[in-house]
A protein has these predicted regions:
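C-terminal, non-catalytic "cap/extension" segments appended to globular domains
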Residues: 2, 6-142
Length: 142
């Protein structure tokens, strides 16, 4: 559901940036289209019920909140990979990150642990892990 919500949110912001209006019927239709596309032709959906998701899903009340899942997963992957790889000082840096609590902005706290979310590296590394898992799954199912 999150990729569908992210696409919807981006499209609605782009419409506003182009000076186009938003109306409930348009938003319902677009949300239903995105869910239908995501589920594929094998599954039928109740378009009015699924289409109104945008109005009932609180994640969409904060700008680009849904995208924070992807960045959070990427950061967590980067933190764990440093520790699992035995990177010297990684565990201690992770403890410093945790100890910072809310005393630092999240991006600054992550830098304490050796993760720079201002670069593409953490997201690229997360995709590499995902690609490896897909490869393993494909090998299992033949």
């Amino acid at each position: 559901i999150m990729p569908t919500l992210a696409r919807f949110e981006l499209e609605m912001h782009e419409r506003v940036e182009r000076g186009e209006g938003l109306a409930a019927d348009l938003m319902i239709e677009r949300m239903a289209d995105l869910f239908a596309e995501s589920y594929g032709g094998e599954m039928s959906i109740d378009r009015p019920r699924v289409g109104i998701t945008w109005a009932t899903f609180s994640h969409l009340y904060s700008d680009y909140y849904v995208y924070q899942y992807a960045t959070g997963i990427s950061a967590a992957n980067a933190l764990s990979q440093r520790i699992l790889a035995g990177t010297p000082g990684a565990a201690e840096a992770y403890v410093r990150f945790l100890s910072a609590g809310s005393s630092l902005y999240p991006l600054d706290a992550l830098k304490l642990a050796g993760v720079d979310m201002a670069t593409t590296q953490p997201v690229e590394a997360a995709f590499a892990v995902l690609a490896g898992l897909v490869d393993r799954l494909e090998a299992l199912v033949g």
